[in-house]
From Swiss-Prot:
This is Autophagy-related protein 8. Ubiquitin-like modifier involved in autophagosome formation. With ATG4, mediates the delivery of the autophagosomes to the vacuole via the microtubule cytoskeleton. Required for selective autophagic degradation of the nucleus (nucleophagy) as well as for mitophagy which contributes to regulate mitochondrial quantity and quality by eliminating the mitochondria to a basal level to fulfill cellular energy requirements and preventing excess ROS production. Also participates in membrane fusion events that take place in the early secretory pathway. PANTHER family: MICROTUBULE-ASSOCIATED PROTEINS 1A/1B LIGHT CHAIN 3-RELATED. GO terms for biological process: mitophagy. Residues 1-42 are annotated as: Disordered. The record marks G157, G158 as: Cleavage. Transmembrane segments: none annotated. It comes from Colletotrichum higginsianum (strain IMI 349063). One of its GO terms (cellular component) is autophagosome membrane. Gene3D superfamilies: Phosphatidylinositol 3-kinase Catalytic Subunit, Chain A, domain 1. Disulfide bonds: none annotated.
Length: 162
């Protein structure tokens, strides 16, 4: 699935934007995935405090609750009937789980508890317990962003009947 953000912005512009964000928030984003500072992410786990404000949008000036963050572009699957999220670019704490990120997305789009939401990375449902930092390292785009799509339906999976 092609990202609408990728379609609207050429690679050079996306890469420059990722670098601008990295520099602006250098205290929150490690400079390199192999830097000594980035290895601190896997330290002793702290109990997460989950609130709708746990994830900062790029425009927010409020500090993050975690030491490092990953850059995420989050978009609705084009034909999904679920609400559209207000912002696309996020700095997500690296030690946040996928399940916690889904909770934040649910809150931002004001999705009622009885409605389902599915998120996809490269058209695959990531494990709920996976850390956002590990998903980022495995699936980040060459421009520096992790592209996540969400839908009200499991559009890429399901059961086939014979």
């Amino acid at each position: 699935m092609r990202s609408k953000f990728k379609d609207e912005h050429p690679f050079e512009k996306r890469k420059a934007e990722a670098e601008r964000i990295r520099q602006k928030y250098s205290d929150r984003i490690p400079p390199s995935p192999h830097s000594p500072a980035s290895r601190l992410i896997g330290g002793a786990p702290r109990p997460p405090v989950i609130t709708a404000d746990l994830v900062s949008t790029v425009e927010d000036s409020a500090p993050l609750t975690k030491a490092f963050a990953v850059q995420v572009i989050c978009e609705k699957v084009e034909k999904s009937d679920i609400a559209t999220i207000d912002k696309k670019k996020y700095l997500v704490p690296a030690d946040l789980t996928v399940g916690q990120f889904v909770y934040v997305i649910r809150k931002r789009i004001k999705l009622s508890p009885e409605k389902a939401i599915f998120i996809f990375v490269d058209e695959v449902l990531p494990p709920t317990a996976a850390l956002m930092s590990s998903i980022y390292e495995e699936h980040k785009d060459e421009d520096g962003f992790l592209y996540i799509t969400y839908s009200g339906e499991n559009t890429f999976g399901g059961f086939e009947t014979a």
